[in-house]
Amino acid sequence: AFDLMQVHNLVDVETHLETLKQWKEDGRVKYIGATTSHGSRHAELEQLMRSGSIDFVQFTYNVIDREAEQRLLPLALERGIGVIINRPFKRSRVFDRVRGLSIPDWAAEFDCTNWAQFFLKFIVSHRAVTCAIPATSRVDHMIENMGALAGPLPDPLVRKRMAKYYAELA
């Protein structure tokens, strides 16, 4: 059995969810969900979350793109829905503002040694987030990303500080 099957980008979501629900009932899959990487589709995803028909959602959330904090993340917490974050680096755009800059000294408080870890820890420290899935084809980037698993996670006040710090770099 599969652990998780998701309807990608909400393509024909109602039809596919019917199949996935049956597969879940049959024990072929443990969890079912839906994904989108488009903020314009958050309302559709929210509707699915409210329907009680899915166990997981996957959407974009990062230090730049924080729209999900308004409705999706609180709703996931409220409903006990797992959250997978895609595009945590916004296709590398989060690095544009910080190229050539060192991470702030205070990032050492939560064991960050590079910007990738800073950005990933911002994401995975949100109480609603189950995991983030940064895409990379480079081993050195994967190793940097894995470093975000080490040490403590930022608390809500530190998360605010991280977002403010990043926003002020613009």
Residue map of PLM features:
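Glycine/proline-rich, positively charged
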Residues: 1-67, 71, 78-84, 125
